[in-house]
Amino acid sequence: MAEEFPRLNALDVAPEISLLDQDSNTFKLSELLGQKVIAYFYPAAGSPGCTKEAADFQDSLEDFKKLGFSVVGISPDDVPRIKSFQEAHELEFTLLSDPDFIAHKAFGAFGEKTLYGRKFRGALRSTVIIDEKGQVIDALYSVSSTGHTKALLKLLS
């Protein structure tokens, strides 16, 4: 039987992660204590759905900032790919590389999915909202790449 990775719930403590960002700098979630964070997990930089989702986060970035949130995108892509993705789409938020799915698994954003009729295990499009104390406000799993940021803004307003 495949290993299961539990999903997070409100009031859980967000797991500590240490990953490389788009500039090859080490990013630790604990360094954002005192700030509210939206950590969104996406399967593949440059794919149509992930590009749309990233563009929507960028278009809504000022609204999230007004609500006191930073945005961090996390994918299994390597650093050069997320750097290229960030530059190509002029993304003004941090992207993190998680090629071994360490953060994905810790946040419950990894599991079985179906693509073109084929089942496999990989990144699940998910969003975890974290308060300034490092506690989960909400965790949303298997979200849609379109319309997600609008729904998120409505939830947080």
Please give the residue ranges for each predicted region.
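Chalcogenol-based redox active-site neighborhoods
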Residues: 1-157
